[in-house]
Regions:
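A polyampholytic, Gly/Pro-enriched intrinsically disordered region
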Residues: 105-117, 267, 376-391
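Conserved Class I SAM-dependent methyltransferase catalytic core
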Residues: 307-354
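SAM-dependent nucleic-acid methyltransferase catalytic core
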Residues: 9, 15, 34-40, 141-278, ...
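S-adenosyl-L-methionine
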Residues: 1-9, 13-59, 65-69
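Conserved proline-anchored active-site loop of SAM-dependent methyltransferases
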Residues: 56-70, 86-91, 251, 257-278, ...
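Class I S-adenosyl-L-methionine
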Residues: 344-348, 354-396
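Glycine-rich S-adenosyl-L-methionine
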Residues: 284-323
Length: 396
């Protein structure tokens, strides 16, 4: 199937089931499993307010998977448009949302033809022998996959790092600004998949002696995923329309810029490890700032990030309380789990002060692989993960 057919084929381009399952960022705490329950809550809120369109807000979008559902549900079936305000502090999240929350109906025939042409050209570009100055290949991949050196970072294969550099050069130097996100977002998704990690970038797999990087580590896990070739992909979109406002800001500052909403969703960071350590390389790829200073450290993460208060043992509770008190919404939806910094009982109390509280357990037999320092201090290692959704009715 060629690019034009992809854009016009309802099975692949305007299919909500595919839209909510494919081209999703590999992300810690990804809420894909929550979608059915959140969809039911959206219906409940619409019924409670006796309206078919909603104004929805989301303060911590992350991978953007729940954002996709909200965009598709804000409006009604008669094309009366709802509004969706979506925010995250990370640049890669803004790029993902700018792409995937675009309605296919908002792309003109000219837009589609231009995108098809760009995808054709970028596929040709990555096959050319002329290479841009290495950036990802220089700092986060070995020079040779067959001769990895102890001093080399091994986040990507040498081939994929070269492809990433080529695609980033093309996107940032040749593609018009209005189209950049449609090529960059699918690339970010692929970079989150085809890398030499367990799903987050705080560390990469090494050999048995931990002396140098090794694809799949000593057990050679997930080699097909890790070494799978990165290729340009058309973004999957749907025809659902809404008035979408994408932001990249601190969530408290963002709240000052939006009006009261019908439904606000918060999925804050849970543990002490900041997301900007776990996913720093996605922001590196998103920003493509080749002039930034890369430190001679294990990860090569630039020292330009700040720790979120939600990842602080001392500040998380007060920060969350301030957030809830400041939120202007008829309903607030929150997701959190029993391994988080804020104890469930204290979170209950904060939300109960805001309005009538409905607590919805989410059954999950998994164990939390990302316990973090906070959980270790509480000696909760290997306890069963309990996840919850809270719906707060804030109406007087």
């Amino acid at each position: 199937m060629n690019n034009k057919e992809i854009f016009n084929n309802k099975e692949t381009f305007n299919n909500e089931e595919i839209f909510l399952k494919k081209q999703i960022l590999t992300y810690m705490g990804n809420k894909r499993k929550y979608l059915k329950k959140i969809d039911e809550i959206i219906v409940l809120v619409k019924n409670a307010l006796d309206q078919e369109t909603l104004t929805i807000g989301e303060g911590f979008s992350g991978s953007g998977i729940v954002s996709r559902l909200f965009k598709n549900r804000a409006s009604d079936k008669n094309n009366n448009l709802g509004t969706f305000y979506v925010n995250d502090i990370s640049g890669y999240s803004k790029t993902l949302n700018s792409c995937y929350l675009t309605s296919s109906k908002n792309l003109s025939t000219g837009d589609i033809e231009n995108l098809i042409l760009h995808f054709k050209k970028i596929r040709e570009f990555i096959k050319t022998p002329q290479n841009p100055e290495p950036f990802i290949a220089k700092y986060w991949a070995p020079k040779s996959d067959k001769d990895i050196q102890p001093n080399e970072r091994v986040y990507f294969t040498a081939e994929n790092a070269k492809i990433i550099d080529q695609m980033l050069y093309y996107i940032h130097n040749i593609v018009e600004d209005k189209y950049k996100c449609f090529l960059l977002a699918p690339l970010i998704v692929q970079c989150s998949i085809h890398n030499n990690t367990n799903g987050q970038f705080s560390a990469y797999y090494k050999d048995e002696n931990k002396e140098k990087g090794m694809y799949g580590g000593k057990k050679q896990v997930d080699l097909n995923r890790i070494t799978g070739k990165i290729t340009p992909e058309m973004p999957l979109l749907t025809s659902h329309k809404a008035n979408v406002h994408v932001s990249q800001n601190d969530v408290l500052k963002w709240l000052n810029t939006i009006p009261e909403v019908d439904l606000m969703y918060y999925d804050p960071p849970y543990n002490k490890h900041p997301y900007n350590i776990y996913y720093f390389l996605l922001d590196i790829i998103n920003n493509y700032d080749t002039n930034i200073k890369i430190p001679d450290t294990y990860r090569g993460q630039p020292k330009n990030w700040e720790k979120s208060n939600y990842c602080s043992l001392k500040k998380a509770k007060s920060e969350f309380k301030t957030l809830i008190n400041k939120t202007k919404a008829k309903f607030i939806l929150v997701s959190y789990n029993n391994k988080g910094i804020i104890p469930i009982k204290e979170l209950d109390e904060i939300l109960l002060e805001k309005g009538n509280l409905y607590k919805i357990p989410f059954e999950n037999g998994a164990f939390n692989k990302y316990l973090g320092i906070a959980a270790k201090k509480r000696k909760k290692k290997n306890e069963k993960l309990e996840e919850f959704l809270w719906l707060v009715d804030c109406r007087p």
